[in-house]
Amino acid sequence: MKIYLVGGAVRDALLGLPVKDRDWVVVGSTPQEMLDAGYQQVGRDFPVFLHPQTHEEYALARTERKSGSGYTGFTCYAAPDVTLEDDLKRRDLTINALAQDDDGEIIDPYNGLGDLQNRLLRHVSPAFGEDPLRVLRVARFAARYAHLSFRIADETLALMREMTHAGELEHLTPERVWKETESALTTRNPQVFFQVLHDCGALRVLFPEIDALFGVPAPARWHPEIDTGIHTLMTLSMAAMLSPQVDVRFATLCHDLGKGLTPPELWPRHHGHGPAGVKLVEQLCQRLRVPNEIRDLAKLVAEFHDLIHTFPMLNPKTIVKLFDSIDAWRKPQRVEQLALTSEADVRGRTGFESVDYPQGRWLREAWEVAQSVPTKDVVEAGFKGVEIREELTRRRIAAVANWKEQRCPKSN
């Protein structure tokens, strides 16, 4: 029996990155031997065991053979005669097909070290094409390591295109697509994930609402980048700089979906695209089974982001109504989230990356003023039932009006 550290732990250590999880491959053993040594079996489809002390995963070396459609259609073979090289060959990328023995020596049968040095994401073998989930995984790795200047090898991107055009991605379940997407949204450069999917044609299959934005022009005066698809990825990049929250990043990604519905004869203007985009956000989220909290914020951002841009022109009643509409009284975090997504929208444009966004500050200030109006004062004043809500709203509007007179500049 020989045990090797494999995959991500080896890769990230060589890149000088923190190692989170360590996975091990056991060569020359059987399930019974592992159980006799005190390991606990956890894998149903193939033999994976938990170490009795560290609880890290130890998998018997195995091979995989395509036996059905999609990413689950594989037959696994695990036996003592499966070599380390056999096991590493089934992995997706060469940089993930590295192993390290007890002496610290790196075993590299597929030139993963060379690809690490050259910052290349390259598939190990043609078997890559048998698993459609790998298209999303490579896009996610491209996003994860973009700050280290990694790029996808030409032949790997070509294979991803072939897989997409062959309809392989249609076998992916919504849950797996969302899981990979959510993971990509946590990276430093989530926009790269969607750019890669666009480059290989997968965006049209998995995110048609986003793909439809590419080639749709916006007024050059406000959008020097012109293309709405490019603007969308720029805003996502900016959102990633402003907030680590997946819901903020996803909402920013979806903020302009309504522009994909504008008839070409009306281009480059997109009047009413915000409210129009809400149903597309709902459609996308329903298809991918996006969590409700993330979906709800994305719908609100689509509907109201342009309203925030015009904040100096809003009257106090409209401002308080906005807080009602986003349910800020029960979910106050939405004010900050709306401020961040609107800022990402404004700064996610060519030449506008460093502009100030005072509307975000004014939104936050107006919220502090409105929510500081004490409910108990209204009750103690003798108001009852529905009158409490009406009087509370009136006082909030008055407080915001007073603040706006002093702090918020008047529009021209």
UniProtKB/Swiss-Prot annotation:
ATP binds at residues 8, 11, 91, 137, 140. It holds the Pfam family HD. It catalyses: a tRNA precursor + 2 CTP + ATP = a tRNA with a 3' CCA end + 3 diphosphate; a tRNA with a 3' CCA end + 2 CTP + ATP = a tRNA with a 3' CCACCA end + 3 diphosphate. Its cofactor is Mg(2+); Ni(2+). It comes from the Bacteria. One of its GO terms (molecular function) is CCA tRNA nucleotidyltransferase activity. SUPFAM superfamilies: Nucleotidyltransferase, Poly A polymerase C-terminal region-like. Mg(2+) binds at residues 21, 23. Keywords: ATP-binding, Hydrolase, Magnesium, Metal-binding, Multifunctional enzyme, Nickel, Nucleotide-binding, Nucleotidyltransferase, RNA repair, RNA-binding, Transferase, tRNA processing. GO terms for biological process: RNA repair; tRNA 3'-terminal CCA addition. CTP binds at residues 8, 11, 91, 137, 140. Residues 228-329 form the HD domain. Magnesium is required for nucleotidyltransferase activity. Its EC number is 2.7.7.72, 3.1.3.-, 3.1.4.-. PANTHER family: MULTIFUNCTIONAL CCA PROTEIN. A single active site specifically recognizes both ATP and CTP and is responsible for their addition. Catalyzes the addition and repair of the essential 3'-terminal CCA sequence in tRNAs without using a nucleic acid template. Adds these three nucleotides in the order of C, C, and A to the tRNA nucleotide-73, using CTP and ATP as substrates and producing inorganic pyrophosphate. tRNA 3'-terminal CCA addition is required both for tRNA processing and repair. Also involved in tRNA surveillance by mediating tandem CCA addition to generate a CCACCA at the 3' terminus of unstable tRNAs. While stable tRNAs receive only 3'-terminal CCA, unstable tRNAs are marked with CCACCA and rapidly degraded. Monomer. Can also form homodimers and oligomers. HAMAP family: CCA_bact_type1, CCA_bact_type2. Belongs to the tRNA nucleotidyltransferase/poly(A) polymerase family. Bacterial CCA-adding enzyme type 1 subfamily. Comprises two domains: an N-terminal domain containing the nucleotidyltransferase activity and a C-terminal HD domain associated with both phosphodiesterase and phosphatase activities. This is Multifunctional CCA protein. The lineage of its organism: Bacteria, Pseudomonadati, Pseudomonadota, Gammaproteobacteria, Enterobacterales.
